[in-house]
Amino acid sequence: MCTDIRLVRLTDRHISGRTLDFGYDVQSRVQVVPRGQRQSAVTTNTAAQTMTWSNDLGYVGMDAFGFEWAICDGLNEAGLSIGTLWLPETTLPTSPPTDSGPGVIDFVHLAGWILGTCRTVDDVRTALASVRIWNAPIKRLWQSTDPLPKNL
């Protein structure tokens, strides 16, 4: 389970941090993602509309296990920060939607999409209302194909 901390000073400066409690090296790397970078979500279902986007905002973030664009924590040029935390109680669909409704994004790419397209928390709320999120299994984390229990 991960822990998130936030220190707020009287001068309105915020410091955030987190633990990444896996008990082994998650091979994090710093990713610098420029404006205009084209990205896409992962889906295994051709009926669902797979999301693709071009970043309006550049951002810097930490990835894990060598998954390119799979951001665990990051900060964009508008000052919006995000952290994905390991919370076993989190439940998301474990397969992508099969209909042709709104865009579908896997949780692995969600943080990067938010950082690349949203300037404020209100933007995030609006954006999240326009997508369906699913929890793609990530076998690289453990031998099981269980999905990754994460939370924003």
Model-assigned labels for residue ranges:
Residues 1, 8, 118-152:
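Accessory structured domains or lobes within enzymes
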Residues 1-102, 136-139:
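A contiguous strand-loop segment
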Residues 84, 88, 100-132:
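Alpha/propeptide regions of enzymes that mature by internal proteolysis
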